[in-house]
Amino acid sequence: AARRDELHDVKVRGNLCAGPVQIVECDPEQAHFLYHTWHCSAYERRLCDRGLCYFTPMIFRNLAWYYREFLTVNVAMASVAPMDRHGYFNLSAVTGVSRAILDRADIVILEVNEHLPRLRGGFDEVIHISDVDMVVEGAHAPFTDLPAHPATAEDTAIANLLLPHICDGATVQLGIGGMPTVLGKLLARSGLHDLGMHTELCSDA
C-alpha cells in the first residue's frame, strides 16, 4: 500500500481476510490494485458491497487443483507456525490449499506466527525452508474468537426439525450462526453416538 503510486495492474487473491486490507483501502478507484477472494469474511462481504472486492465462486475441494492447473502466481505469502527442528514450517489452518499456491509461486514469502496451531496430515501441510525465498518474523497478538450469534426462535424451531433426521454414526457439519449452535447443543443432549464432524470450520456449536 505504501508503494501504491509505483505499482499498476497488481492482482491480489485473498481468502477470509479479517481486514483491513490496506491495498484496497488506499486505492478505492482500483487504479493500482484489484482484490479477489474465494471465500468472503464479513469484512470482504462489505468490500464486495462497495465494489472493492471481486468474489470468485469456488468449491473448496477444487481450489488446490485450480491453482495447480490454471493459475499463475508471481508472489505467494502465507502465515505459518514456527519452523521445527527439521526445517519445516507448518501451514496450520490453511493446509487445504496453501501448498498448491506456494508450489505455483515464483517467489514464496512466509510470515511466522507463533500463535498458529500445527496441523498434521499427509505431507502437504508443511513447506521446507529450502523452498522459501523470504521469512517475515515479528510479534503477533493472540487470536480472538468471533462473537457467538444469539439464536432466534426460528433458529430453535429449525434445529428441532433437523434433529430427528440425524442418526448414530452420522457425519455433521455445523457452521457459524444461531441455528448451528442450537443444533449442536441439541446433539450434545440427544444421546446420539459415533457422530463424525466435517471440519471445514469449527465453531462453538
Q: Residue ranges of each PLM-predicted region?
A:
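Conserved alpha/beta enzyme-core scaffold
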Residues: 1-205
